[in-house]
Amino acid sequence: MTKSTKILGLIGRAVDYSYSPLIHNTACRLLGLSYHYTVFNIADPSMIPDALRGAKALGIAGFNVTIPYKKSVVPFLDALSAEAASIQAVNTIVNEGGKLTGHNTDIAGFAAPLLPYRESIRGKTLSIFGAGGAALAAIEAFIRFFSPKEILLFVRNPEKASLLLEESGHDKSAPVRILCSDNPEIIRECRVIVNATPIGTRGNNDSPLPLDRELLHPGQIVYDMVYNPLDTPLLLAAQKAGAATISGIEMLIGQAEHSFTLWTGMQMPVKAVKESLLQEIQQ
């Protein structure tokens, strides 16, 4: 690092496990860019306003934002991109001369690994477990790119999820049905199953699966947003059942690629970065 090095970082809580520093620092090194990406753990949502004011004062170039702050940062930003405004959730912040603009690259990042399946997904019933910012991004991606018959949102608290959708400015004409996660029998008819919860994350003490493994079958695509471990309990169960699987690493790289371009104006060398990331994970 030098005096001219620009600082980037990840805003989250207890996210030292994140691979985002490796991804972005590798990309910057390969392209010869003078940036350094680090982690900013924020213990409580009440500290978010001070953190963002400090970022302006210190000239920090930008952030990624992860659980549980993707919605918490929104009121304290100066502007939102169309994508971020559409779901009132932010995963990327760009500091342009003291103006903080929130973006959401999760939408495009989530959609990217599903695009090869687009024709087989159109008009089908799709499902998501979870009701946070990541789930909202998945809903928006499904609607924008895949024209589903219906999106089933499995949650622990349907009333809270309904309020979250309403607050996000969600299009009420979209085919979203909220269901309690303790009764997912209908999952059998879903073409795509997405885990947008922390269930399965290394060190998470919840049940390792968001659904009964007996509901999985070869006609499904199972997409786990969790990326640590690489082979989550859900993905292993899905593979055993003969379903197609998508690792959270794909979304992690996809959203990171778009964030990187917003900050630097450059294209991320995705292939080389992904190779470096997988090598690190497998060690």
Swiss-Prot record:
Enzyme kind, highest EC tier: oxidoreductase
InterPro entries assigned to the protein according to its UniProt record, in alphabetical order: Aminoacid_DH-like_N_sf, NAD(P)-bd_dom_sf, SDH_C, Shikimate_DH, Shikimate_DH-bd_N, Shikimate_DH_fam
Record's catalysed reaction(s): shikimate + NADP(+) = 3-dehydroshikimate + NADPH + H(+)
Example GO molecular function: shikimate 3-dehydrogenase (NADP+) activity
Keywords in alphabetical order: Amino-acid biosynthesis, Aromatic amino acid biosynthesis, NADP, Oxidoreductase
Record function comment: Involved in the biosynthesis of the chorismate, which leads to the biosynthesis of aromatic amino acids. Catalyzes the reversible NADPH linked reduction of 3-dehydroshikimate (DHSA) to yield shikimate (SA).
HAMAP family: Shikimate_DH_AroE
Entry's family note: Belongs to the shikimate dehydrogenase family.
Protein name, entry field: Shikimate dehydrogenase (NADP(+))
Species of origin: Pelodictyon phaeoclathratiforme (strain DSM 5477 / BU-1)
